[in-house]
Amino acid sequence: MATTANGNSKKRDGGLSSLAPRKINVQKFSEARAPELESLHSIVSERLNKDFRSKRNKRRRTNSYNNQPAKKRNIKRQKSQSLIGQVSGGDHEVKITRRVKRRMELKGNPETGFCTSGDGTKRLRTHVWHAKRFTMTKLWGFHLPLGLHGRGRGSRDVLKQSRQGVLVHDASYHIAVQLEGPEGSLLSILNMLLEPSPSSHSKEVFDSILTGGSYENAMLYHVEPPVSQAIAPVTYMWRPSKIPKRRNEEKGGDGIGTDLPVSDKDHEDFRKLWVWIHASSFSEGYAILKVACQKQMNETGVSVDCFSLEGQLAKLEIFGSKASHLLQKTLHPATSTSENPSILRKCSMEKAEVKNVADLYTEENVSSGAILAQFVIDPRLILTSPHDDRTVSVETIKTEPTESVETTTNTEAETFPEVFNCLWDANSELTPPEEENMLCWEKHQSRMDSLCLDDPAAEVPKVSSRPRSSRSCPLLLLKHKKLGNAPTGWSLILPLSWIKVFWNAFVSKGAHAIGQREKRWVSCDDGLPFFPSDFPDCKAYSSFTLSEAADLEEKAQRRPPAIRPFRIPIPPPWNSIHVTRSIGEGSNQKFSSNGRSVVEISSYGGNLFDGIVARTSDSLTTFLQTFTSDNMLLFPHNTSKPSTDLMMTLQEDDKKVRAQIHQSSNKLCLVRVLLHAFKEGSFEEGAVVCAPTLADISLLKSSCSEGEDGRVTIPQSSVSSYFQEQPCGTWELNVPEDTLTEQSHRWPIGFVTTGFVRGSKKPAAEAFCDAVLLGRLRDEQWRDKDVRRRKKQIYVLVRNLRSSAFRLALATIVLEQQDYCDVHCF
C-alpha cells in the first residue's frame, strides 16, 4: 500500500475501490464522453436534416412548450408563499386575500378546535380530502361528506367493500362529554338518564363496564317531564381505575368481575366518565346532562363536574372483513427507548413481537365491546417490506417511554392514568404530531446518507412555532359489538390533531372512505338502525326529515307543473296509526263528516312524533302488561336478569317506563321491525305498512295468481289522496266514505324509515310499527292454525307512497331476535 500526501491509502495495482465515491463530478463525467456525444448528435442531425423541430402532423398540443396555466399557478403559489412569510415574519399588518387565509387554515393543524367557514360551520380535519372526492353538505353545524358524486348510486360497490375489504369513516362530529365526581353520584345520573341503565345489566357485564374494561350503548332521555322523551343513542365508557376495597384479595383473581355490588358504599372514589353524543343532538344532550348534575348536587350536596371535550378528541370508525388486518399494518406500539433526537434511526421488531401485535387485533383474542389502550408510532414513520414478513422496519426518532401494548382488562391502575393523562385530563395539552416537512427532510437526509452523498443545500426546514411535537400517539381502540350480520368493526379515539395522519395512513393502505349516505347503506344491510333516520322518537329525526322535505320541495318547484310529482308526507304522519288502533278497539267507531277520526291526537311539543319506541325487552314487557284486555302475542327476548342487589335501581327504571306509558292513553308504542319481501317488491323510505286481511295473504301467497286479479291495489285516484295535507301543514289519514274505496282501503300500522339497498344479498327494509297492532295481527294469523305451521314473522302489506300496489312482506320484530336491547346504532 502506498500513502498519498493527503494520508489516504490506495491499492498498488490501481484497482477500483470497493467503496462508492463520496462525490460525483458531472462535468468531468461529460467531458470524458464528449466524443461519443458529438458523434451521436451528428447522426441524429443527419437523419433530421438538421431540423430538430417536431413535424406538424405529429404535433398534438402545439402550445405545450408554453404552459401558461402552469406558469400562472406557479406565480400564484410564489405570491401566496411570500404573503404567508410576510404575515408570519413581519411585525406590520399585511392585508392578505381570502384564498390565502383559507389555505393557511386548511393546511394548518392546530392542537384543538375545528376550522370554521364564514357562517360558522365547522370543518372536519379531513375536509380538504373529502371535498375533492365527495359531495359535501351542511349538517348539524358541520361540513360533512354526504356521498360520492352522482345520483346516489354505487351501493353495490360499497357493500362489496364491507364484505370483502375495509371501510373507514371520519366520525369526528361525535362529541364527548366528560363527567367527574364520586362513583355513586355518576351511577345515579346514568341510571336517571339512560335506558338500559348500567345497573340493569348482569353482574359480569356491569363489573366490566365499571372497571373500564368495556363500553356500553344506551338511549339518553330527559330527566324532567316528559319523563321519557328520547334524545339520542350514546356510548359511555369509564376511565379504568383500581379500587382497593372492591378488589378480591385472592392472588389468583384477574381483577375483573370481582367488584362488590353498587349498594356497598363503604368506598366512594373520584371517577371519570365519557358520554359520546351525536352532533345533531349534542346541544340537547349536553344540556340535560348538566341539568342532571345540578339536580344530583341539590339532592345530595355532592358536586359533579360536566364539561364538553369538543375540538379535543376525534373518532375514526373502521369496519369490514379486513378491518383487523388494516390495524395490524398501521398500528405499531411505541417501544420504550430513547435515542439521539437529531439522528434518524432504523429499528426492527422481532418476529415474535410482530406476531403478538398482529394477534392483538384478531377477532378471537378481543371480546366484543372491549377497550384496548395503546401508544402507537406515527404511521408515517412505518415502512413495511412486502417481500419479507419476518421483520417490520420502523423509522422513528424519539418515542416516549411507554408500555408496548396495554389492555384495559390487564392494566395496573397505577400506570394507566399516567399513560393516558393527555386523553382523560381535560386540562392537559394534547401533543400534536411532527410536521410533514420535517419528516420529509429527515427521510431525504436518510436517503442521501445511504447513497453516501452530501447535500450542500441541505437546510433544516422552517416549522411553525409549536412548543413541542410527538412521534407517538395515545389512542383507545373500541371493538364493535357483534350484532347480526354486522362486519368486524373498530372505533379509534385519538387527539384531534392526529386525525389526518391516521386517515391518510388508512386510505393509503387500501381503506375505502365512505360518507353519510354510504354508511346508512351498510347499516341497513346489516339490520342496524342509523341515527337520526331510524329514531323517530328523537327531535333530531324531526328536524332532519323536515330539512329533507324542504330540499325535495325546492327541487320539485324547479320542474314544470305538467311533470311535477304530487306531494307526499315527509316525515310520515305517525299519528295516523291512532285511527287504525281505534278501529280495532271497537267496530262502532264513528268518524266525523270531514273524514277525521274522533280520536283525539295530542301534539308533543316540537316533536312530530307522539309516542314511545320500545328499545329494550323490559320496556316492551312493561308496556304489554298495561294491556291486559288484549291477548298480544309478542315475545321480547330477555337473556339474563340482574342480581338481587340491583333490584332497587331496576324499580326506578320501571317507574320511569310506566310513567311514560300512563302519561297518555293515546300514546303509540312502536317497535323496530325488519321487512323482507315475500315474493317481489322493493320498499322505499316513507312507504306505509298496512294490516292485511286473511284473504289478502292467501291471494298474494298463491303462485298461480297473475295480472290484476292476483294483486291487492287501491284505485289510482286514491294514491295521491291516501294522506291529505291540512292548511296548518300537517298530514292526516283520509278515511274512505264510499263503499268501493273502503273495500280496497288498508289501515296503516307503521312506516318504513330506511328502504331497500341495491346490491344487498338479502334486501331488508327497516320500519317502525305499533306493538299493539302487531300483536293483534299475529293473533289473527295464528288462530285456527297448527303450532308447527305458525311463522314467527308477521305478514304485513307494504305500499310505496307513489304506487297503487300492495306488496306482501314478512315483518321480524328485532326485540324478539336480538338480545336484551335495540340501542346499538351503527
From Swiss-Prot:
The keyword rRNA processing applies. A motif (Nuclear localization signal) lies at residues 58-65. Residues 1-24, 49-91 are annotated as: Disordered. It is found in: Nucleus; Nucleus, Nucleolus. The keyword Nucleus applies. Keywords: Nucleus, rRNA processing, tRNA processing. GO terms for molecular function: ribonuclease P activity. Disruption phenotype: Accumulation of unprocessed cytosolic rRNA precursors, especially the large 35S rRNA precursor, as well as of the internal transcribed spacer 1 (ITS1) fragment corresponding to the region between the 18S and 5.8S rRNAs that contains the A3 cleavage sites. Residues 70-79 have a biased composition (Basic residues). InterPro entries: Pop1 (IPR039182), POP1_C (IPR055079), Pop1_N (IPR009723), POPLD_dom (IPR012590). It comes from the Eukaryota. GO terms for cellular component: nucleolar ribonuclease P complex; ribonuclease MRP complex. One of its GO terms (biological process) is rRNA processing. Its main location: nucleus. Component of nuclear RNase P and RNase MRP ribonucleoproteins. RNase P consists of a catalytic RNA moiety and different protein chains. Several subunits of RNase P are also part of the RNase MRP complex. RNase MRP consists of a catalytic RNA moiety and several protein subunits. Component of ribonuclease P, a ribonucleoprotein complex that generates mature tRNA molecules by cleaving their 5'-ends. Also a component of the MRP ribonuclease complex, which cleaves pre-rRNA sequences. Required for rRNA maturation, including 5.8S rRNA processing. This is Ribonucleases P/MRP protein subunit POP1. It comes from Arabidopsis thaliana (Mouse-ear cress).
